[in-house]
């Protein structure tokens, strides 16, 4: 039997986290290949329905990552994201998903090392949770 490798969808801010991911790549830092980056202009633009859809389509974990509070290119986008993620974590169990499968982080543009570390940590955390229930239902 194959070892479970989780699928992680990461919504990343164009101005900070995506730049950190690029820096990690150019610095030849490694992070798991099962993390799929979706670049958004700001984490404040990530609608909760995109996160729920990612889970319903079989993602084992979702990351939303952007600029540190106070450093948002769009002034308050990361504050909006923080409020949305907090509310979404409260309702995820109603959809049958463990709230530990959703994570919000702040990664600055020059934090390539931190980006790679967070990706590895997230994959390890989600791997310990096992496959998402939506994915198990799709197989049946």
Annotate each language-model stretch with its function:
Residues 1-140:
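Iron-sulfur-associated redox domains of electron-transfer enzymes in respiratory
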